[in-house]
Structure formats: C-alpha cells, structure tokens
C-alpha cells in the first residue's frame, strides 16, 4: 500500500471554478495563510473505479464546490495580530492619500505614491470585514467612502452651477479684482431679485391670474371705452398704458375680495404680507452678506510676507485647461501689479499744502454740479406737472418722457464730471473710488427724492380728483337708475323689462394713484436700461471701432492719445446698479412685475457688459486691488434700501387707497387688512393677544432691547478683533526674539569652534 501526500495543484477543471469563487471574495493574498490539503489515500492495487452515470457525477461536482466554498470561508479567518497590523497599514495609507499633495516631492513621485496607496486601500479594506463581528465595520467603511464621494461630487456640482463663473474669472484675469468685483456684485443682485420675483409671482400674480375674475369682468380689469381703439398700439404699450395697465403687471388690476378661487386664497392679505416680506428679506440678505464679508475679512492685518505668499502659493496645480492656465497667469500678474502699486503708494511723499488746495477746489466744483443737477430736476418736475394738465395728444415724445430722460442723462454725464474732479485730488485709487461713489450716490439719491416729491404732489392731486369722481359716480348711478325706471314705466303691466346692465368699459372710474406710481417706476427702469445700453454701444463699441480701424491713417496714435479705448467705469456702473435696485424696492409694491423686469435687465446686462468689457475696454491705468470685503458696495445698498422703503411705508400707513382699484379698495388704510384677517379668521383670544403684542409701548421696549444687544455684540466684536491684533503682534515679537537668540547661539558656537582650533 503506497500512500502519496500530494500538495495542492489545481487541475484545469478545478482551477477555473476555484478562481471564480476566490475573485468574489475581497481579500489580500499576502495576508492569507498558505493552506495544504491531503487527498484520500490511493492504493495502487485497487481496481479502477467503475464509470459513473451523469447524476452521480453532478452530485460529486456539487459536493466538491461546496467543500471549496467552505474552505475559502475558513481560510478568510485572520487572527487578531494580523488584523491589527492590517488596520494600521490601512490608516497609514489613508493618511497618505489625504496629505500627499502637501509633501515636498516631485509630481511624478506624488502620483506614484497616491496610486499605490489607493490600490492598497481598495484591495485590503474589505479584509477587515472577514470573520465574525467584522462585517459591520466593513459596511461602515464602505458607506463612509460612498458618502465622502457623494459630498465631493455635490460640491463639484454646486461649483458648476454657479452662473457666469468662467466669465467673471476671465474678466478678473484681464482687468483685475476691482472690475471683477462689479460683476460679482451684479450676480449677487441677480440672486436677490430672483427671490423677490418668485415671491411676487407665486403669491400675487399667479393666484390672481388663475383664480381671479377674468379681464373684462370688472371696471378695474377693463380698458375704458375711450381707450379701446389704441389700447394695443406699440406706443401705448411701450408707455405701459392700455392693455398693459389693465393687467396683472400693476396694482389696480387686483380684486378686493377677501378670498378667491376654490382654495379660498386670501389675495389682499397675501399682497400686503408679500410686500412686507420682500422688504424684510432684502434687509436680512444685505445684512447677512455684510456680516459674512466681515467674517471672511479676518481679524486684522494680514500683509506679512505678502510677496512671498504670492510667489510660492499663487499657482493652482490642478489646472488642466490651457485657457484656464492663461487666465490664471494673467490673474497672478495683475495681483502683483496691484500689490506693487499698493507698496509704492505707501512710500510717496506729498506736498500737503498743494494737495489741500486742489481737494478744496475739487469739492467746490462737486457742490456746484450737485446744485445745478438739483435745480435741473426741479425744473423738469415743474414742466412735467404742467404737461400733465394738457391734452396728451398735443404733446411730443420728448415732452412725455422729459422727466425720465433728464434723470437718465444726469446719471450718465455727472459721473464723468466727478471723475475729472477726482484727478485734482490725487487720492489713492481705492480711496478715490470711494469718494467718487459717494458723490454719485448723493447725486442719484437727490434725483430719486426729487422724483418722489414730485410723485407725492401728483398723488395728492389724484386723491383730490378721486373725491370729485366719487361725486360724479353717485350722480351717474342716480341718472342711470332714473332712466331705467322711466323705461320700465312705459311698459304694460304684464311685461317684464330687461335687466339693468352696464358694460364695465362704460363705467366711470377713479384715477388709481397706486397704478400711476407703479407705471412711473417701470418707465424709469426701462428708460434707464435703454440709456445704459445705448451709451455702451456709442461710447464704447463705436469708439473702439473708430480707434481700431482709423488708427492706421490718422495723424496721431489714437490708441495712446485722444480718444483711445475707454476704461470700465466702475463707480458709474455700481451706482447705476444700486440706484436701479432702489427703484425696484420702491416700486415693486405698486407694480408686482417690477422684480421680473429687473431680472431681465440684470440677465442681459451680464452678457452685454461682459462682452463690452472684453471687446471694447482696456484695463485701468491706475491699478488697485478691490477690498477683500465688499461691504462698501453693500453699505451703500443698505442705505438706499432704507431710504427707498421709507416712502413706501409712509404711503401704506398714511395715504388712503383708491376706492375702485387694487386689493385694498374700500378700506381707509392698507394695513387694515391685518385687522380684518384677525377678526374673521382667528379666534377672539388669539386676536386679543396679537393686539396686545402690537402695543406701541411693548414694541418700543423690544426695539430698545434689540439696539442694546446690537451695541453689546458690536463692542464684543471690536474687543475680539483688538485681541487678535495683540496676539499677532506678540507672535511676531516672539518670532523676532527666537531669530535673534538663534543668531547669538550660532555666533557663540562659531566663536567656540574658532577658539578650539
């Protein structure tokens, strides 16, 4: 009897099946113990086995595979020592994956080490789940990897969804951060207006369109008979009269019923609350952006080793696009120019007496310009009031649009004058920009408030006119009833007269001062947009074409002399954007469509102005870096928001709404819709509690507490900022002391070595 112990050598038939089973098991080959199996004892004298039938052979093959599978499972049992060693190796490789880009190695070595670490983790991470009690750990590791990948992909998705990011990066690389800050501000304003539009469209315009009474059902929703012939003309629609006036675009179209539609939607309440909500949201988002910028600004001075940081840390090694690399190169170059200009400006010696005289002269000219523009606005307002009393058919296009055109032209030419005056002052470019913005802001704010005062006079005239219209409507109704009764008296006894009916287009109506206010703001917005675009086409595009194609045959160099290419007017564009947004906040309560019109304006402005900057403008001769916190723009926006909402709140609280148009018709004041809702839709005890909470004494106390809290938080923030500055100074001083101590120790060691020799 010969016994043969055979070391396992997989045969062809067994090799394929065993490898298929092993591939399904994620394990590390090097950590799996070697295994040997002793086959059955083979006796050479035994007779050859009889041939098996098909069923017996299949049963034996199935049993063999079951034994192989069970053996593979037993083989996966790893002892505790090997398991701990594998965990340590996996943690080490994961740490290497996370920190390999920070290693001071060549790129080839980084890539090679990263590939090896990822391969090791992917091959051996599943081995931790083999054995009793380890599968839950493997599942957690797998889910952690999938969650990290999901977060990374989601961040990439959010970055890809940021609108106009590549356009703004290209502009920043060519023109610097100061010009790019305007487009970033424009994009932020686009997002704010998108939220305002969603609120007004979904809660005001859409419910009225779906559930309100259709056009022609009420006098407020019908074009008067005298205007029907010209209601659809382009000139009338461009002036937002005719069909545009009697639509959901303006305040007067909305019905004053408490509920509309099968959902019993409370439209007057929604209209009032959405108007207040838009104002509150605007304040909240501006203040939040300002606080975020303050947080991003850091705690103090951060200019230590400024040029060293720019030299060694500016390049992004993950860039793989040649165009992106060119933009990044230009951006780094522009950043160096900005930093060098900042450094030189801090070392320039100035003639203080000459500079003071020139600055006084510049401010004198600025005050003259502001006074002249104010007088011109006042004169235009007086003329517009005179034109309002005349027949509109006798007026020309300029006479109808004189007020809007004067304001647009002043906003276009006065910033250029202020820019010329700023050349006399010789401020640092960033400080000069702030002075220029402040002057243009004062100009536009004065123009806006003169416009509001003119509107207030017109509103008072409309309110007086309403009283006469009410009396006339009463007489008209009495005459109509009298005529109807007379027509019935002429009929025989058994004859029924026709029902009394008057078409809504024939009913007399009031002037509806709210719609008039909304129309004025919409017209001013549209005229401002058209003026801006025409200015870009004529002042930038045609000028650039003339300089580009006529420079070869001209007497002097047009590119470096007069007229040359234009520079991008940061101050004028920023103030125009802020001024326009102030008009949106002021007029959106009386024209719910105004945020949507402004979205179209901002959307087209982004593409149009980006094209104009890249094709028609040149970088500024005086390069400067924009502030890291954009709070100067936001501060002016917050001020214009406050000044814009004051007239609106005054109109809501003090002026009576029109009697025959708008959702608040029939009430003495617009805010009475809140009391009406409390009376009809809330329990009496809740209405009583809300009235007590609205007590002026309690409101004043809450406001005082809020003011004191804000003061305390502001003082705390200033103290923390001062503490951060002190800590930075101490750290710098400690670094200098350590440096001097190391130098002394090195000198002492050198002296000792020299003495020993």
Swiss-Prot record:
Effect the entry attributes to changing residue 528 to C: Reduced sensory transduction current
Effect of residue 321 to K: No impact on interaction with CIB2 and CIB3
One example of a Gene Ontology biological process annotation: regulation of calcium ion transmembrane transport
InterPro entries linked to this entry: TMC (IPR038900), TMC_dom (IPR012496)
Annotated tissue distribution: Detected in cochlear inner and outer hair cells and in neurosensory epithelia of the vestibular end organs. Also expressed in cortex, cerebellum, eye, colon, ovary and testis.
Compartments in which it is found: Cell membrane
Ranges annotated as spanning the membrane: 177-214, 266-297, 354-384, 397-424, 429-463, 513-550, 570-590, 594-616, 631-654, 698-731
Effect of residue 554 to L: Reduced Ca(2+) permeability. Reduced channel expression without affecting conductance
Stretches in topological domain Extracellular: 215-265, 385-396, 464-512, 591-593, 655-697
Functional description taken from the UniProt entry: Pore-forming subunit of the mechanotransducer (MET) non-selective cation channel complex located at the tips of stereocilia of cochlear hair cells and that mediates sensory transduction in the auditory system. The MET complex is composed of two dimeric pore-forming ion-conducting transmembrane TMC (TMC1 or TMC2) subunits, several auxiliary proteins including LHFPL5, TMIE, CIB2/3 and TOMT, the tip-link PCDH15, and possibly the PIEZO subunits.
PANTHER family associated with the record: TRANSMEMBRANE CHANNEL-LIKE PROTEIN 1, TRANSMEMBRANE CHANNEL-RELATED
Domain remark in the UniProt entry: TMC1 is structurally similar to TMEM16 channel and may include ten transmembrane (TM) domains with the ion-conducting pore placed between TM4 and TM7.
Assembly information from the UniProt record: Forms the MET channel composed of TMC dimer (TMC1 or TMC2), TMIE, TOMT, CIB (CIB2 or CIB3), LHFPL5 and PCDH15. Interacts with PIEZO1 and PIEZO2; the interaction may be part of the MET complex. The interaction of TMC1 and TMC2 with TOMT is required for the transportation of TMC1/2 into the stereocilia of hair cells. Interacts (via N-terminus) with both isoforms CD1 and CD3 of PCDH15. Can form a heterodimer with TMC2, TMC5 or TMC7.
Designated name of the protein: Transmembrane channel-like protein 1
Gene responsible for this protein: Tmc1
């Amino acid at each position: 009897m010969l016994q043969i112990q055979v070391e396992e050598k997989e045969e062809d038939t067994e090799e394929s099946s065993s490898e298929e089973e092993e591939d399904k098991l994620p394990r590390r080959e090097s950590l799996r113990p070697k295994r040997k199996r002793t086959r059955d004892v083979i006796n050479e004298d035994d007779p050859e086995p009889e041939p098996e039938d098909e069923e017996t052979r299949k049963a034996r093959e199935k049993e063999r595979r079951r034994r192989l599978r069970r053996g593979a499972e037993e083989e996966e049992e790893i002892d505790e020592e090997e398991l701990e060693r594998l965990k340590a190796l996996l943690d080490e490789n994961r740490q290497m994956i996370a920190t390999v880009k920070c290693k001071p190695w060549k790129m080839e070595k980084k890539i090679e080490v990263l590939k090896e670490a990822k391969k090791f983790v992917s091959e051996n991470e599943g081995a931790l789940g083999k054995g009793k009690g380890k599968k839950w750990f493997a599942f957690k590791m797998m889910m952690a990897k999938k969650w990290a990948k999901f977060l990374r992909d989601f961040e990439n998705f959010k970055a890809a969804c940021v609108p106009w990011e590549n356009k703004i990066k290209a502009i920043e690389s060519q023109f610097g951060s100061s010009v790019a800050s305007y487009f970033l501000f424009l994009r932020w304003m686009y997002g704010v207006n998108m939220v305002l539009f969603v609120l007004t469209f979904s809660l005001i315009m859409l419910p009225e369109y779906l559930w309100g009474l259709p056009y022609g059902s009420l006098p407020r929703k019908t074009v008067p008979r005298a205007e029907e012939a010209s209601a659809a003309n382009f000139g009338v629609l461009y002036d937002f009269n005719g069909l545009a006036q009697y639509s959901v675009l303006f305040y007067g179209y909305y019905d004053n019923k408490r509920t509309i539609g099968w959902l019993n939607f409370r439209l007057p309440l929604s209209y009032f609350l959405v108007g207040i909500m838009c104002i509150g949201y605007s304040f909240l988002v501006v203040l939040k952006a300002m606080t975020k910028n303050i947080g991003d600004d850091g705690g103090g001075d951060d200019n230590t080793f400024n040029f060293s940081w720019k030299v060694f840390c500016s390049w992004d090694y993950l860039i793989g696009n040649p165009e992106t690399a060119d933009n990044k190169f230009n951006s780094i170059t522009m950043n160096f120019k900005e930093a060098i200009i900042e450094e030189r400006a801090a070392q320039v010696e100035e003639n203080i007496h000459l500079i003071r005289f020139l600055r006084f002269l510049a401010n004198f000219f600025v005050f003259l310009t502001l006074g002249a523009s104010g007088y011109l606005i006042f004169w235009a307002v007086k003329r517009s009031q005179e034109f309002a009393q005349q027949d509109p058919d006798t007026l020309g296009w300029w006479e109808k649009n004189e007020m809007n055109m004067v304001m647009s032209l002043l906003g276009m030419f006065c910033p250029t004058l202020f820019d010329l005056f700023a050349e006399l002052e010789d401020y640092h470019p960033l400080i000069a920009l702030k002075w220029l913005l402040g002057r243009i802001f004062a100009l536009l704010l004065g123009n806006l408030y003169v416009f509001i005062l003119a509107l207030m006079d017109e509103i008072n005239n409309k309110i007086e006119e309403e009283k006469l219209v009410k009396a006339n409507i009463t007489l008209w109704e009495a005459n109509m009833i009298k005529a109807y009764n007379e027509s019935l008296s002429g009929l025989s006894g058994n004859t029924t007269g026709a029902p009394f009916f008057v078409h809504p287009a024939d009913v007399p109506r009031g002037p509806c001062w709210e719609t008039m206010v909304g129309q004025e703001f919409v017209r001013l917005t549209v005229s401002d947009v058209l003026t801006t675009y025409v200015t870009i086409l004529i002042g930038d595009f045609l000028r650039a074409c003339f300089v580009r194609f006529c420079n070869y045959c001209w007497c002097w160099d047009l590119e470096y002399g007069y007229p040359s290419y234009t520079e991008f007017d940061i101050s004028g564009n920023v103030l125009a954007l802020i001024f326009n947004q102030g008009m949106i906040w002021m007029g959106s309560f009386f024209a719910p469509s105004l945020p949507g019109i402004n979205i179209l304006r901002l959307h087209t402005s982004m593409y149009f102005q980006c094209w104009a900057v890249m094709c028609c403008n040149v970088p500024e001769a005086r390069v400067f870096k924009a502030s890291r916190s954009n709070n100067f723009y936001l501060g002016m926006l917050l001020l214009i928001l406050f000044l814009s909402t004051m007239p609106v709140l005054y109109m809501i609280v003090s002026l009576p709404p029109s009697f025959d148009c708008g959702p608040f018709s029939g009430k003495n004041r617009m805010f009475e819709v809140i009391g009406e809702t409390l009376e009809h839709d809330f329990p009496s005890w809740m209405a009583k509690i809300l009235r007590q909470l609205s007590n002026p004494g309690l409101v004043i106390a809450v406001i005082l507490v809020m003011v004191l809290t804000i003061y305390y938080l502001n003082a705390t923030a200033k103290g923390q900022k001062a503490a951060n500055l002190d800590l930075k100074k101490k750290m710098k001083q400690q670094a200098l002391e350590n440096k001097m101590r190391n130098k002394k120790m090195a000198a002492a060691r050198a002296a000792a070595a020299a003495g020993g020799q």
